[in-house]
Amino acid sequence: MPIGVPKVPFRLPGEEDAGWVDVYNRLYRERLLFLGQQVDDEIANQLIGIMMYLNGEDENRDMYSYINSPGGAVLPGISVYDAMQFVVPDVHTICMGLAASMGSFILTGGEITKRIALPHARVMIHQPASSYYDGQAGECIMEAEEILKLRDCITRVYAQRTEKPLWVISEDMERDIFMSAKEARAYGIVDLIALEND
């Protein structure tokens, strides 16, 4: 039997009594964002809306985006990345578990020097995929052209954010490349490994 989203007490400044809010709303008030699912239009719009609200509320307090995502749709992922670049506060990105495909793209979009992976996190990059398999020939050609444009956009962002040559990123994206936290740091996708002792 599902219990739903847990509720936690929260007291507004100046209030005597605490009210109950769902745990995500409480965390959002602390500027903690979570991407714990596939990237789609709905979660992208939620994250962008929260970032814009927090940006307007206080431009001086950083935001923290925790990522455990198998990836998802390309355009919603790019829109989350763009929103992270647009807001004034720094956005720290923290990979817990898996940041694959669009998840790793969003992870890379955190403020440089503030991109973190937990010690046992995994990161995966690859090229975007098409959804047209049984369309008209003209539709398939147009879709392929659009995918190539998106691939170029993603490749350029990875190259800029990791400081790797464009050709290296392009070659690596030809297949699924899985990385440990240390490998992701060496690659330039993250800057730090949390809880690291050495």
Swiss-Prot record:
Keyword flag Ribonucleoprotein: no
Job description of the protein: Cleaves peptides in various proteins in a process that requires ATP hydrolysis. Has a chymotrypsin-like activity. Plays a major role in the degradation of misfolded proteins.
GO CC annotation, single: chloroplast stroma
What is the species listed in this Swiss-Prot or TrEMBL entry?
Psilotum nudum (Whisk fern)
Q: Name one Pfam family in it.
A: CLP_protease
Which PANTHER family does this entry report, sorted A to Z?
ATP-DEPENDENT CLP PROTEASE PROTEOLYTIC SUBUNIT, CHLOROPLASTIC ATP-DEPENDENT CLP PROTEASE PROTEOLYTIC SUBUNIT 1
Which keywords does the record carry? Chloroplast, Hydrolase, Plastid, Protease, Serine protease
Q: Is Cell division one of the keywords? A: no
What InterPro entries does the record tag this protein with? ClpP, ClpP/crotonase-like_dom_sf, ClpP/TepA, ClpP_His_AS, ClpP_Ser_AS
Q: What is this protein called?
A: ATP-dependent Clp protease proteolytic subunit
Which reactions fall under this protein's catalytic activity?
Hydrolysis of proteins to small peptides in the presence of ATP and magnesium. alpha-casein is the usual test substrate. In the absence of ATP, only oligopeptides shorter than five residues are hydrolyzed (such as succinyl-Leu-Tyr-|-NHMec, and Leu-Tyr-Leu-|-Tyr-Trp, in which cleavage of the -Tyr-|-Leu- and -Tyr-|-Trp bonds also occurs)
GO MF terms here are: ATP-dependent peptidase activity; ATPase binding; serine-type endopeptidase activity
GO biological process per UniProt: protein quality control for misfolded or incompletely synthesized proteins
| UniProt EC number | 3.4.21.92
Q: Which cysteines are joined by disulfide bonds?
A: none
Starting at the broadest rank, the lineage of the source organism is: Eukaryota, Viridiplantae, Streptophyta, Embryophyta, Tracheophyta
